[in-house]
Amino acid sequence: MFSKVSLALLLSFGLFTAGCTTRDLSAEAGNKTKVGIVFDIGGKDDRSFNAAAYVGALQAKKEFPIVLRDVEPGDPTAIEPAQRAFAQYGYNLITGVGFAQGPILTEVAKDYPQLHFVLIDSVAKSPNVASLIFKEHEGSFLVGMIAAYTNKTGKIGFVGGMDIPLIHRFQTGYEEGARYVKPDIAVLVNYVGITDTAWNNPGKGRELANSQYERGADVIFQAAGNSGLGVFDAAESYKKFAIGVDSNQNWVKPGFILTSMMKRIDTAVYSVIKDEVEGKFKGGVHVYGLENQGVDYALDEYNKPLIPQEVIDKVEQAKKDIIAGKIRVTDAMAK
């Protein structure tokens, strides 16, 4: 029986209307697979990390018989109640978006061994959790190369969100890619903060980018969630370049986004939902890198005029060399 507590939680998150009974909810679901997503505090409209997960889920909804509900907590303290609300109602697949949800999701998954869970950007050692991990350092190496080939000042920049090992992986790959092209290039580095709020502070992101542009950087790679939108604003203001992250963000500020380091979170989320619907869910660690199109750089109508073909050719060759093991990119989280 669906408890009054969990119903109250679902209502508080706006998942269902107050007039909707559990019988109504069961009728709506029918034989459909119930999928719940708990985003991080950046929300699904961040045009980056969360948005990519949402795109993948929406694509799955179009193709498969699922009921899809989501929660945008807005505050870290709301994450656990949201996960538990989905679990108490018996959602078949519950996704936690972002490494910060790892400890909570691990405990919730243990309490509900009959359900399946997805954790993005962290590893939960539980057989009913699919942990989706990306080789961000590989994709960051490629955009670092593009930044260096574009650079005219001898300085480029990096603005990270929360100062944590996961984002160091982006930074290190970017630095190594840039120095693969220009060994003496200087990389200016700043982080928005050390708490979860660092992902949702565009004003601080813009402030840091302004400083880097003032100090001579002409390309800045942001790996900062919603805070990265402030970096884009600075790029437009200074008429310099920025590099997007997670999703293809080239369209956000056309002409000022040099490229984007894409994590195919959309593809990964779609795939795990597909597996759940087809009865093929597999727990454990799922790794996405260049070799399986899990990461890449974005090239489209918005940025093709910004990158010469000879640069694209060199980056494509480097991609092949990374896949073949001829170029080894440091994984900052493996140190």
Positions of PLM-derived features:
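Bacterial N-terminal signal peptides that target proteins for export
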Residues: 1-7
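C-terminal motif of bacterial Sec signal peptides marking the signal peptidase cleavage site
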Residues: 16-19
